[in-house]
A protein has these predicted regions:
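Conserved, well-folded catalytic cores of nucleic-acid-processing
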Residues: 9, 13, 29, 53, ...
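Residue-level micro-sites within transmembrane alpha helices that shape
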Residues: 8, 52-56, 82, 155-158
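Helix-coil boundary and interhelical linker segments in multi-pass alpha-helical membrane proteins
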Residues: 28-39, 103-110, 165-173
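Soluble-to-membrane junctions at the N-terminal ends of transmembrane alpha-helices
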Residues: 1-17, 73-92, 111, 115
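Cytosolic regulatory modules rich in charged/polar residues
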Residues: 1-44
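Alpha-helical transmembrane segments and their helix-entry boundary regions
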Residues: 5, 79, 110-111, 144-149, ...
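Juxtamembrane helix-loop transition segments at the membrane interface in multi-pass membrane proteins
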Residues: 30-39, 54-79, 129-152, 167
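Alpha-helical transmembrane segments in multi-pass membrane proteins
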Residues: 12-20, 43, 47, 51, ...
Length: 173
């Protein structure tokens, strides 16, 4: 039984470990932005962690609903719409808090970058997190094993892209 559990998990973890290179490539492509505003690097763990947590909460909720029969594969659009709105509200709340703290500790421009990024990351992560268990079920994968690692990997890379595009626009980098 132990090796069977390992086999059921290792394939996805290996695929995702390799795909995590995407996150490294994103950071590499925005190296000049980080060099011009080093303070941005301090917020990376907060932003990627928030994205992963938001997406994983949504995935866990939907995975449970799938297991209980409260959600079916055909409900994907309704789930996507609901989780997008939940993510926006969570992102707005966390974004306001992030804006206030970053503005007080650094400056208002950094606050705008952090607040806006939290809104975008939470919206995207909740949407992806809500849809991923359903897609996993459609392709015959176990949503409980596949969803959370994929969400974390995807949201890290996508969240950093959102972050650096917003930073470039707001800070003029």
């Amino acid at each position: 039984p132990l090796l069977k559990l390992v086999r059921s998990r290792i394939v996805w973890l290996l695929v995702l470990a390799v795909s995590a290179i995407l996150t490294v490539k994103v950071l590499d492509s925005f190296e000049s932005v980080l060099e011009q505003a080093v303070v941005l690097s301090l917020f990376i763990p907060l932003l990627t962690g928030t994205g992963g947590n938001t997406g994983n909460q949504a995935a866990t909720t939907v995975t449970r609903a799938l297991a209980l029969g409260d959600v079916r594969k055909s409900d994907v659009l309704q789930v996507m719409w609901r989780e997008m709105r939940v993510g926006m509200l969570l992102g707005a709340t966390l974004g306001i808090l992030g804006f206030i703290i970053a503005s007080l500790v650094y400056d208002v421009h950094i606050g705008i970058v952090i607040g806006t990024t939290l809104l975008g990351i939470c919206t995207l992560s909740a949407t992806v997190g809500g849809v991923m268990p359903i897609l996993a079920k459609v392709v015959g994968a176990d949503p409980a094993v596949f969803s959370n690692p994929f969400i974390s990997t995807f949201c890290d890379a996508a969240g950093l892209i959102i972050y650096f595009f917003i930073a470039r626009a707001v800070l003029g980098l």
